Amino acid sequence: MGKTYSSPVNPIPKAPKGLAIHHWLNFLQAAYRLQPGPSEFDFHQLRKFLKLAIKTPVWLNPINYSVLARLIPKNYPGRVHEIVAILIQETPAREAPPSAPPADDPQKPPPYPEHAQVEPQCLPVLHPHGAPATHRPWQMKDLQAIKQEVSSSAPGSPQFMQTVRLAVQQFDPTAKDLHDLLQYLCSSLVASLHHQQLETLIAQAETQGITGYNPLAGPLRVQANNPNQQGLRREYQNLWLSAFSALPGNTKDPTWAAILQGPEEPFCSFVERLNVALDNGLPEGTPKDPILRSLAYSNANKECQKLLQARGQTNSPLGEMLRACQTWTPRDKNKILMIQPKKTPPPNQPCFRCGQAGHWSRDCKQPRPPPGPCPLCQDPAHWKQDCPQLKADTKGSEDLLLDLPCEASHVRERKNLLRGGGLTSPRTILPLIPLSQQRQPILHVQVSFSNTSPVGVQALLDTGADITVLPAYLCPPDSNLQDTTVLGAGGPSTSKFKILPRPVHIHLPFRKQPVTLTSCLIDTNDQWTILGRDALQQCQSSLYLADQPSSVLPVQTPKLIGLEHLPPPPEVSQFPLNPERLQALTDLVSRALEAKHIEPYQGPGNNPIFPVKKPNGKWRFIHDLRATNSLTRDLASPSPGPPDLTSLPQDLPHLRTIDLTDAFFQIPLPAVFQPYFAFTLPQPNNHGPGTRYSWRVLPQGFKNSPTLFEQQLSHILAPVRKAFPNSLIIQYMDDILLASPALRELTALTDKVTNALTKEGLPMSLEKTQATPGSIHFLGQVISPDCITYETLPSIHVKSIWSLAELQSMLGELQWVSKGTPVLRSSLHQLYLALRGHRDPRDTIELTSTQVQALKTIQKALALNCRSRLVSQLPILALIILRPTGTTAVLFQTKQKWPLVWLHTPHPATSLRPWGQLLANAIITLDKYSLQHYGQICKSFHHNISNQALTYYLHTSDQSSVAILLQHSHRFHNLGAQPSGPWRSLLQVPQIFQNIDVLRPPFIISPVVIDHAPCLFSDGATSKAAFILWDKQVIHQQVLPLPSTCSAQAGELFGLLAGLQKSKPWPALNIFLDSKFLIGHLRRMALGAFLGPSTQCDLHARLFPLLQGKTVYVHHVRSHTLLQDPISRLNEATDALMLAPLLPLNPTTLHQITHCNPHALRNHGATASEAHAIVQACHTCKVINPQGRLPQGYIRRGHAPNVIWQGDVTHLHYKRYKYCLLVWVDTYSGVVSVSCRRKETGSDCVVSLLAAISILGKPHSINTDNGTAYLSQEFQQFCSSLSIKHSTHVPYNPTSSGLVERTNGILKTLISKYLLDNHHLPLETAISKSLWTINHLNVLPSCQKTRWQLHQAQPLPSIPENTLPPRASPKWYYYKIPGLTNPRWSGPVQSLKEAAGAALIPVGGSHLWIPWRLLKRGICPRPESNAVADPETKDHQLHG
């Protein structure tokens, strides 16, 4: 062995001549364990001693190390004594019984018989001291040398293991090198078994922990490929070697490993033979699927192997390999049962065999004469195959293999006959026998021997049998039967079959001439009549399964698919594809076209298509229907979701599953919707226009396809459900589960369902059908007689460093199995918290100690993941566990091993979660779940809330959940301190009995005000918070500044917390707040609640210790009511603490800003003399003409607001530009509206009038000059549309337009003053400031009101013509008639009524309202007393 390998830098010492390699490795492993390590001198002395020991007569095989130690001379140099002592210590002495095989016999594979001597266990591979740090890859000569050493030993035998160990020790291979070595040394069967065992060992090692292994760096196999990972690579080498010892026994040369596919044998028949052979010969516990999949490709004929290679399915699932071979094999066989050749008249020439005419030579019954003498016996009368010398000795003949394929050439090749002599080649059509899934290959044949009449019999056609088998009763009595050994699917047999060495004639129904066989097998038990390949090859017939082409099935066409509104079809361009993808896409489209799922199409609409490569190398057709889905209306799904399989009663023990293939491709698509499902197959390199197709059936990817299929399938199964009321049919998508109380009823139900599905044309997958007894796999779960488990459970590695993707994926798997995992929500919540706060998907998460402990808890709980099936006679009980992190609810039944379901519900995303509301929600959820899945509500609810807390909540809470809890209170059961019940043995979770402090009320709310307690008023805003503590007087008040990022709610919380901090000494407190949020928060806290995630979570948590144990009265105060009660005044005082004080304007400042009149200053706190002094001292008012010097005007005024307006346009120069000011003034109140424009047009006048109407209201009539803008057609039409009377006056006439002209002067004077104060003041600002001064500041001296107050006053009432108003206290006035130019005063007369702005004066037998400016007080002409009239008279001329 040492000569076969290349020498490393520090070569391993070679074995002495005559010593087996596996023995030498034992000495090397012992030498490497010396301390200190061995030297070259030690190895030299060891080799020298072993050379001498081998030649001694006491040398034993196997080696007895105790005897060997006695042969070592005393004072022998080196450390040979220590090496042999290590071997004696590691190898316990055993005596081999007589029945044990020799220990060095490499031909006996493991496991050995019970009493066989077991080879000493070799320690893990140790590399030599000073070995190089890098490994050496294999070379071909190295692999050949290793294979030559182990060629005569079975995998796993001692010699095999020692040889491989030495190779590993010399080359230090990586994981890839070990994989190459396994493929080179062992068969595909052994490699597959070794791979299964290695995966198991790696998983166990990763769980226990490996030195140097980093889970984040990839699998162990990937890390072991790194040549620098020397320690980790050696761990992998030991696992790889240990996998051989775990191989099942008898793995060398199994009988079923040599089963090959015949040249004409269908692939499905070949796979069926393999499957039967594996079922009969595979050791128990060995996985069958990988071996069957490996042999199905490696032992297939060349045609199927080439096909599977071209399709990329050499390692695909077995169903896909079968489908590929059945679909893509050449269709060169005619689907004809039996067809005879065309009859032609026999020739006139004599037959060259028998010399007689009247028949063809091929139909001659005489054997063809041999071409020459037999090469064995030189007899010219027979052929070589009929030579007696070949038949003389059959005892030493080789065993017959029944299941080996035929090696004959292709028998269906067309014969090329010479054309000449008037002879034509007969038209030969080969007989083919089509089979179906339900039909067995059986024919009625007749069997005869020489000098016997034919006997009819039913024969089974078997292309896997090499030789024909006949029953013994057909054999003539004088037959000479010979012993033989037959190797079949059940193993070798020496007694069941005999060989008959004489000709036998078999008459087939489709052949005139019989098939003549030189020999056949005789079944001594009269069980089998088989026509093998020897008979089928002579008649040139073959068996095949008739193809059943896929077609659009007779399923009902759906009436609604969501596109009935017929929107415009989408037009999404097809994107380019590389040649590989385009070729795969062309192949996929061809398959869909053959299956009649699509058809050529010419019309509008297009959606892109592309292929996706699966992990197994196959391609999948993807039609991007997102554009169509966006146009489609959602259909209401009849399915509420996947069923809970625990609802399957235990009294329905007999189960069967039915799986439908290509479910969505069975629903026909109406032609009107084809534009929405059209696509284009592009040409390579755009060499031509693409080919257009559209779906004939609803495709995958359409969002309503699952809903439509469920509706169709439910309609098909509805009659079956009515016919079998005692059975259950569970349907979800294309998976169907049947459950019945009796096997006979299940059989009838299965037949009924199968017939219904077959009638509608829905194909079923027979490979995936499962039935009891045994477990049933359905919807990812395993159904056992009394429980439900999941097919796969997530493997959790307890570690502190996780990537975000790993943790998210693991939690997703946990969510799938959470209904059966006995763990509380708190453990899951800890892991959910670890996902928060990350924005980069590539982040790495470091778990806290609490989260790592949660991982351990979940890992233990997964080992108990199991759920019980429903017992219909027992009630359903519920357990509710409330925790701050969420609610855990359990549904279970008494006397059962496992619960029905675990439900984990997170708390709602609110700042405070009252436990009473959570309990009510859990009750509603459990009742709904139980009623939906089990058909009954819960009998009782067990919860972890004390009776005292529940009673207090029901008596004091005003929440809506109180009504729900009272309704279900008769079903409540408190767990108590020491609970008793079925869950003590059922639920292995001790945390459910822990008390929750949060559920206890932290403080008590008093229903009335507490007399002896102080009062706390608090408030807050985004920048400040304040509180006042009052007890007969203000004890303390404080204003708190807040951070800039604070919200209003946080400000209110800050104020309340500061007030509570100051009120700590008092056991009771009255709290008055104007925040409904805080009032509700305190009331919920008093009842007991869980804190939720919020931005103010820390502030909410600080409330609990400050209120703990207090008695509190809470009162809500409405703010800004201006009431004078103490509560409102103290609340306003709290608000005032947060407001910055606003200093009122003094009269001097007000005049400096606005230049208002003295009456306005008196209205703002100045006396008459002070106001006059302020105006006189103003420099701006001195420079610019004061308002008092403007000329007076006399016009016709309105008697009420918005009766008569005057309008005018005045011009103003501002910064070298000329502006037009369109002024409107009400003649009753004098209120003004101004619009600044650049032009004076009809449109500008309309805009200005609209602006005035929006502020002052709509006038009854307007009065303007006769300018072109006011007389324009546009302005006149606008006034007519609003029913406004328009009249004109004489411009610049005091008696016609005096009011508006005076207003223009006042306005321009104020603007000039403002611009004098600030030259850069914008014109719009100056105009607005002027309007504020004129309308809202300046006070009219006649009525002591502003123009705006006068304009908003109540209008004067209308006076009836015939009735006089009631007389008031007499007042005498001199008056002038409005509108007249007479300067003389009339009167005095007594006023009948006075109002704001005018007085009612009798004039000439009628009554007129005279404005105050045309009135002056007079003295009664005949006073009744000596009272002197008021000598003060005032001119009521309006001033600005």
Curated annotation (Swiss-Prot):
Residues 593-783 form the Reverse transcriptase domain. Residues 98-113 have a biased composition (Pro residues). GO terms for molecular function: aspartic-type endopeptidase activity; DNA binding; DNA-directed DNA polymerase activity; RNA stem-loop binding; RNA-directed DNA polymerase activity; RNA-DNA hybrid ribonuclease activity; structural molecule activity; zinc ion binding. This is Gag-Pro-Pol polyprotein. Binds 2 magnesium ions for reverse transcriptase polymerase activity. Binds 2 magnesium ions for ribonuclease H (RNase H) activity. It catalyses: Endonucleolytic cleavage to 5'-phosphomonoester; DNA(n) + a 2'-deoxyribonucleoside 5'-triphosphate = DNA(n+1) + diphosphate. The reverse transcriptase is an error-prone enzyme that lacks a proof-reading function. High mutations rate is a direct consequence of this characteristic. RT also displays frequent template switching leading to high recombination rate. Recombination mostly occurs between homologous regions of the two copackaged RNA genomes. If these two RNA molecules derive from different viral strains, reverse transcription will give rise to highly recombinated proviral DNAs.
